[in-house]
From Swiss-Prot:
It comes from Phaeosphaeria nodorum (strain SN15 / ATCC MYA-4574 / FGSC 10173) (Glume blotch fungus). InterPro entries: ADH-like_C, ADH-like_N, GroES-like_sf, NAD(P)-bd_dom_sf, PKS_ER, Trans-enoyl_RdTase-like. This is Trans-enoyl reductase sthE. Pathway: Mycotoxin biosynthesis. Belongs to the zinc-containing alcohol dehydrogenase family. Substrate binds at W137, G138, T139, A140, A141, L142, A143, I144, G281, F282, E283, G284, Q285. It comes from the Eukaryota. Monomer. PANTHER family: HYPOTHETICAL OXIDOREDUCTASE (EUROFUNG), TRANS-ENOYL REDUCTASE STHE. Keywords: NADP, Nucleotide-binding, Oxidoreductase.
Amino acid sequence: MLPANGQTAVIQSKTSSHGLPLVVAHGRPLPPLPTPYHVRVRVLAVGLNPTDYKMVTHFFMQDNTAGCDFCGIVEEAGPQSVLGLGLRVCGADFPYRPSNPYNGAFAEYATADSRHLLRIPDGVSDLQAAGIGAIGWGTAALAISDPAALDLPGLPSRPDSRGLPVLVYGGATATGIMAIQMLKLSGYSPIAVCSESSAPLCMSLGAIGTASYTSVTCAEDIKAIAKGSKIKHALDCITDVESMAICLASLSRTGGRYACLEAFPDAWLTRRAIAVKVVMGFEGQNVDVDLGHPVYTRKANPALHAVAGEWARELQLLLNDGQIKTQPMQEIGGSFEGVIKALEMLQRGDVKGKKLAIRIAYSK
C-alpha cells in the first residue's frame, strides 16, 4: 500500500549540514507516472554513481530528489507497462533535471519506464541488482550503438563477426565493466585501460588485454595488444586530459571515433579526424534535459530511447543466463543517511574498484 503521508527521500537542500547539499526529507509527494509505460517501484536497495555527487555539486536544484540506480518491487503499473505487479526489477531514473522534482532512486518509491527495467533472477541479491541498475549499462549502450558515438552495429543476439578492437579507458569503472562485457558478447575485442590491480577483473569480463594507465608507454601497449589491427573506436569512461590523450594516441592515423562521458576543453582535442561525442546516459529516457550548459543540455531523442530499449532486452537475456557481472559490491549501512555518507566517500575518492550499495527496505 502506498504511504498516505508521503515518502522519505534524499533531496537537494542548501540547509544541509553535510559536505554535500543533501538532506533526508519526510512527507515528500510520490512521483507521478509520466507515461502509460511507467511503473512505480518500492525501492529495496540503491546503487551509487559518481554522477550522484557531481550533479548536486555542479547543477544544484533545490528540493529535487537525488539518485539514479535502484532495485525494487513493482507496486503500480501504467496501462501499457510491459511488467506486472510484484516483480523484482532494477533500473534507473535521471532525476537531475528541473522538470523532475519528485522522482529519484534515493527514496521509498521511484518511477521508471518499464521498457528499460530488468527483471531480477532469484539468484541475484537486491544489492547486486542495485549495482546493475541501469546507469552503467545504459551509458555503455548509447556509447556503443549511437550512430553519433561509436556506431558499432553488433549486439549479443547478432554479434559482429569482424572482432574489431575497441579501447575502453577506465575499464574497471561501473560503465567500463558493463562496456567490456557488452562489447565482448557483441563480437568485439575490448582492450581495457585500468590499474594493474584491476587487470584480472577486466580480463575475466572479456578484455583481450589490459594496459596500465600509469605506464609511460600506455598508448604503445594498447597498440601492441591489438596486434596490428587498427583501433578505430575508443570509449573513455574517465575523461581527463591524460585519458583523452592516450585514447587519441591509440586511435588509427586514418581517424576513428571517440566517445567520452564528460565535457572537455577544446584544447584537449588534438586530432581533428576523430569523430567525438560526449555521451549522456539520460538521452536514453527520451526527455528534454536543460542544465544550462551546452554540452549537458539535450532534447528528447526517440531514436536513442529505442537503442536503450533494445539493449534492455539484450541485457535481460544475458542476466537470465548469468552472463552479467557487476563491480565488486560494498554495502554501506544507515539507509538514507547512509546514502549521503557513501556519496561523500565517493566524492573524497575513498572508494576504488567497488560499487557502493545501500539497503533501503526488505521484500515483504
